[in-house]
Amino acid sequence: MSLVIPDKFQHILRIMNTNIDGKRKVMFAMTAIKGVGRRYSNIVLKKADIDLDKRAGECTEEEVEKIVTIMSNPRQYKIPDWFLNRQKDIVDGKYSQLTSSNLDSKLREDLERLKKIRAHRGMRHYWGLRVRGQHTKTTGRRGRTVGVSKKK
């Protein structure tokens, strides 16, 4: 960061209902938004023609609006389908990039659907057990510890 802070420097930006630190570089500052990682923020900034070495607080209003529009409509800006975090949605078959509260609600809906159709994954979630095939004989124990009484 340069020693002189520009006149229109914002220390905290508000993008997609998330506070973003203006002192960090734009690419890394955008990762504070849930559902946005370094790779996705990198490709969005390249599509928006924004310098990656720029600090987030130095972005103008137009640049912020451009970032938001690209993030909300990634397919219109030629971001490939395999890059998105919601591919072939089970309900409508669309490809999209979910962020912040939309991501939380979609994940919750997916789990509710799995529980409702009584799929194996849904039942494991319901029982509070490991879902992805891990061993559970010794690890993942919660609750009260059961002691062993000593023989007299």
UniProtKB/Swiss-Prot annotation:
Q: Where in the cell is it found?
A: Cytoplasm
The entry's keywords: Cytoplasm, Ribonucleoprotein, Ribosomal protein, RNA-binding, rRNA-binding
Q: Does the keyword Zinc-finger apply?
A: no
Q: Which residues form the signal peptide?
A: none
> Quick one: where's region Disordered?
133-152
Task: Report the function annotation for this chain.
Answer: Located at the top of the head of the 40S subunit, it contacts several helices of the 18S rRNA.
Q: Which NCBIfam families match?
A: PRK04053.1
Pfam families attached to this UniProt entry: Ribosomal_S13
GO terms for MF: rRNA binding; structural constituent of ribosome
* Bilayer-spanning residue ranges: none
Family, similarity comment: Belongs to the universal ribosomal protein uS13 family.
Q: What is this protein called?
A: Small ribosomal subunit protein uS13
List the InterPro entries.
Rbsml_uS13_C, Ribosomal_uS13, Ribosomal_uS13-like_H2TH, Ribosomal_uS13_CS
Q: Name one GO cellular component term.
A: cytosol
The answer to whether UniProt assigns keyword Ribosomal protein to this entry is yes
Query: Which Gene3D superfamilies does the entry mention?
Result: 1.10.8.50, 30s ribosomal protein s13, domain 2
Its chief place of residence is cytoplasm
- Report any one BP term from Gene Ontology: translation
